[in-house]
């Protein structure tokens, strides 16, 4: 389907909703930033906002600098290879919402017939993607649906999506429960939720001594002013905590897939409406 404007096609426009009232609305009801809908709603007076904002600002700097990808194109290609088993295992098709999807790298693994939207609070990421990342990910050379929004207030109509995808983002949101309630709302009744993230203690629930020592060292270094060692995540759930979060918000977890590269430390949980 051709894009109606640079960042939204007719399908995406047809399912827009006010992120607060959830009432259907049009592009004209939103503020536009650099051609992109800005539907971001922040809980500035709610506990945790200041910590979230500090972490979000740090993440945005890292995202555009390519931090953690010293080998450039090859590092991004390795990332693709590490993620491939996930999407070989889960058949993500249909109408897809990628929450915290940034520049839409999930598209690298999707069927071309699927309809896709990414939402993310970092609107500027669209214009500041590292060139090495664009070279590695074929999908980044193609246009896609993008809206500036946060996970806690999704600007789409209820029951609009077959899949809601949440990869490496639930430990970055201010209110995880609200993010999952919104995922529940926008999913079709037979839709699926996929949550992927590092869990504290991994599959066994016990943090290895080496990891524990590293975490303590990083905490000490951040306390003495070395900001590059500061942990900017908003929380660190165990596998049990993550399952509880999912089920407490109306879902039934049906399958857990442990990403091979991360050796039982990163899990992808498939869930459906209970």
Predicted feature locations:
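N-terminal, positively charged/glycine-rich alpha-helical extensions of SAM-dependent methyltransferases
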Residues: 2-67
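Conserved class I S-adenosyl-L-methionine
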Residues: 193-221
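A short glycine-rich, Lys/Arg-flanked "PGG" loop and its adjoining helix->strand segment in the class I
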Residues: 177-192
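A conserved beta-strand element that flanks and buttresses the S-adenosyl-L-methionine
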Residues: 165
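Conserved alpha-helix/loop element of class I SAM-dependent methyltransferases that forms part
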Residues: 72-94
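Core SAM-dependent methyltransferase catalytic element
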Residues: 244-274
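Class I SAM-dependent methyltransferase SAM/SAH-binding core
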Residues: 97-153
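Short alpha-helix
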Residues: 230-249
């Amino acid at each position: 389907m051709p894009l109606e404007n640079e960042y939204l096609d007719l399908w995406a426009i047809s399912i827009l909703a006010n992120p607060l009232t959830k009432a259907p609305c049009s592009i004209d009801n939103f503020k536009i930033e650099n051609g992109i809908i800005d539907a971001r709603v922040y809980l500035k007076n709610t506990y945790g906002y200041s910590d979230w904002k500090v972490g979000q600002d740090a993440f945005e700097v890292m995202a555009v600098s390519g931090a953690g990808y010293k080998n450039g194109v090859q590092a991004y290609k390795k990332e693709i290879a590490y993620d491939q088993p996930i999407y070989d295992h889960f058949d993500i098709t249909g109408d897809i919402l990628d929450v915290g999807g940034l520049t839409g790298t999930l598209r690298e693994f999707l069927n071309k017939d699927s309809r896709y939207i990414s939402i993310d609070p970092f609107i500027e990421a669209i214009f500041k993607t590292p060139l090495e990342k664009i070279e590695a990910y074929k999908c980044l050379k193609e246009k896609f649906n993008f809206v500036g929004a946060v996970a806690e207030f999704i600007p789409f109509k209820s029951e609009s999506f077959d899949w809601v995808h949440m990869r490496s983002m639930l430990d970055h949101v201010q209110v995880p429960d609200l993010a999952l309630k919104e995922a529940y709302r926008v999913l079709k009744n037979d839709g699926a939720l996929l949550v992927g993230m590092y869990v504290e203690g991994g599959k066994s629930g016990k943090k290895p001594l080496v990891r524990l020592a590293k975490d303590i060292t990083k905490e000490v270094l951040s306390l003495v002013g070395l900001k590059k060692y500061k942990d900017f995540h908003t929380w660190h759930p165990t596998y049990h905590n993550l399952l509880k979060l999912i089920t407490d918000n109306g879902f039934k977890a049906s399958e857990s897939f442990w990403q091979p590269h991360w050796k039982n430390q990163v899990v992808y949980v498939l869930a459906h409406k209970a």
